[in-house]
């Protein structure tokens, strides 16, 4: 994941200092892209320990269409707690938009197209439902993703409008890489690339020291991901995912900007 470390270094050395909604302040740049060959390994950061369980359970939660944190909490995942209301609800965020945007199941539509019309340029899933943004606890940061098939290989590109590079981006890369692997499996396709594209790409000011610490670390080889094939995209469970040969440096704690 040297590609990610290059982004950290670029932000620290050439980014622009800006104010932001949270009041913490950021150093940011606009427009950045990284590419990961999924056949070469699972792009899970090795220069700090990542909480793999949270990545998997959150993705399964999105795919279920659920927007209440009860399922996450029951499985020891607390990453959405700060934004939930007293009942655990988050409003019509990612899962709702993916699986039921005005009655449309975007995930099912893309899977159908992958199987029947893989050259389509319309294989997109969007979470940016303008009519419902004010009902969401947090407007989508990872807004839109598109699939592309070439030579029997499935690739995915994500557009992330707001990218918290230290905490959020490594998590998002792994999550969408995993989703791409699941979609490829369900559509009987080989693995292509995961392309991450960021809009406002930023480091919070209270993450500078952590980023500098991470830059001192040498990346390890990427782990492998083994997925037991489920009957459908809706039938995967946590136990279907096996992370193999994940060697990493120690975790680096950093505060979440709410």
Swiss-Prot record:
- Give any GO molecular function from the UniProt entry: thymidylate synthase activity
Pathway, per record: Pyrimidine metabolism; dTTP biosynthesis
Q: Name one Pfam family in it.
A: Thymidylat_synt
Binding sites annotated in the UniProt record for (6R)-5,10-methylene-5,6,7,8-tetrahydrofolate: 51, 164, 257
Q: What is its EC number?
A: 2.1.1.45
Catalytic residues? 141 (nucleophile)
* Presence of the UniProt keyword Transmembrane in the record: no
Q: Where does dUMP bind?
A: 21, 121-122, 161-164, 172, 202-204
Record field: catalytic activity? dUMP + (6R)-5,10-methylene-5,6,7,8-tetrahydrofolate = 7,8-dihydrofolate + dTMP
User: Has the keyword Phosphoprotein been applied to this entry?
Assistant: no
Q: Where is the signal peptide?
A: none
According to its UniProt record, where is this protein located?
Cytoplasm
One GO-annotated biological process of the protein: dTMP biosynthetic process
The main location class comes to cytoplasm
How is this protein annotated for GO cellular component?
A: cytosol
> Which keywords does the record carry?
Cytoplasm, Methyltransferase, Nucleotide biosynthesis, Transferase
The entry describes its oligomerization and partners as:
Homodimer.
Functional description taken from the UniProt entry: Catalyzes the reductive methylation of 2'-deoxyuridine-5'-monophosphate (dUMP) to 2'-deoxythymidine-5'-monophosphate (dTMP) while utilizing 5,10-methylenetetrahydrofolate (mTHF) as the methyl donor and reductant in the reaction, yielding dihydrofolate (DHF) as a by-product. This enzymatic reaction provides an intracellular de novo source of dTMP, an essential precursor for DNA biosynthesis.
NCBIfam families named among the record's database cross-references? PRK01827.1-3 (NF002497), PRK01827.1-5 (NF002499), thym_sym (TIGR03284)
Family indicated by similarity: Belongs to the thymidylate synthase family. Bacterial-type ThyA subfamily.
Question: Which protein, by its recorded name, is this?
Answer: Thymidylate synthase
Quote the gene name from the UniProt entry.
Answer: thyA
